[in-house]
Amino acid sequence: MSSTSFAPRIAVAHIAILVMSCALAPVASADTVVVTAARMLDVLTGRVVEHPQITITDGRISAVGSAGAEIPAAARRVDLPGVTLLPGLIDMHTHLTSDPHFSGYRRLQFTDNFWTVVGVANAKKTLEAGFTTVRNVGSANYDDVAIKQAIEQGIVTGPRIVPATYAIGATGGHCDSTELPPSVSVPKPAVANGAEEIRATVRKLRKYGAEVIKFCGTGGVLSKTDTVGGQQYDLTEMKALVDEAHMLGLRVAVHAHGTSGIKDAIRAGVDTIEHASLADEEAFALAKQHGTWFSMDIYDDDYILAEGEKNGVYKESLEKERSIGLKQRQTFQAAHKAGVKMVFGTDAGVYPNGFNARQFVTMVKWGMTPMQAIQAATANAAEALGRTADVGAIAVGRYGDLIGVTGDPLADVAQLQSVAFVMKGGEIVKASAN
């Protein structure tokens, strides 16, 4: 790594000026953009590249080279002195249509469509925080599909969304409504029991726009009445779900805190384990054998315990979080040391969307290097999504999704909480300090 000193204020001011001048370029030059910077993280090799020059044509990267290379005629230039470029970040576990300030029973005061609007606002915050792709693993009323469609049509601003729609769950489980009495409880569309019901539910969610299937294999923290580690689907049910999803070309994420549920989910063939709090050495070995990824939300314990009570989180949930938060971090450390494949997943929505990058510091504190944490949110995440042709690295053929920080994220990974530059598909989204 170069010992070049950084000047954040000057660099950010310079970004703003240069981007404004670029915005005045002729429309005819907008199809090709050339971006230069002080350095770039090559997440595929783990190297730092000095003075990169990236050419983006029609939204995709067409060349990656060194500054001074030939620039296409009529190209629009974006020069970022003092800036470190990274690929757009990927969060593998978001809930865009959630707001932690309205937790527990407080959520019930709003109309269903209120949460669609919340999701639109959160999508913009998430993109401006440097997350150009998210996997949204649970959203009512197919809201994440609606927001994805609105983003793709240019109606609203947000990241690329891989939507799960509803999370599938067993009656009385973490993905069911467990806080209301029978007289007012409303059946959830993705509650399913037994192999055939589960298969039919997978088909229904795909019909209405799901691009990944998420199900609850064990209890959880923020549900009111279940035990956090208790298994809620047996191996036969899990295998039926996974087989159906894979047959339809969809990958599968499982919410699983408990040990037995994690192991059965891996045996059933899931692609990612969400939370993985109580995974043991046997689970690590199974994950390595099957190529299963862990997506562990190890920052949000801080937020839940600090803010949860005043936000309306159930007393029972706070007790569960106190019992499992530290253990999950210890499991993360052990799983990483054991060589389990890891992706970056935050559970944003449990804490505010837009603050997703807070988790990088926690991942480094619990055993990863800054580069490993960044790779979890870029190259690894793209591989787990099955979208390495499109996202996850600054490489020819992939989308022109770039972010820039004015510090050195390998020296201080907290720099990723203050992204100064965001580009999605070759279009500048943000070019100023937070």
Where are these regions (language model features)?
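Bacterial N-terminal signal peptides
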Residues: 11-25
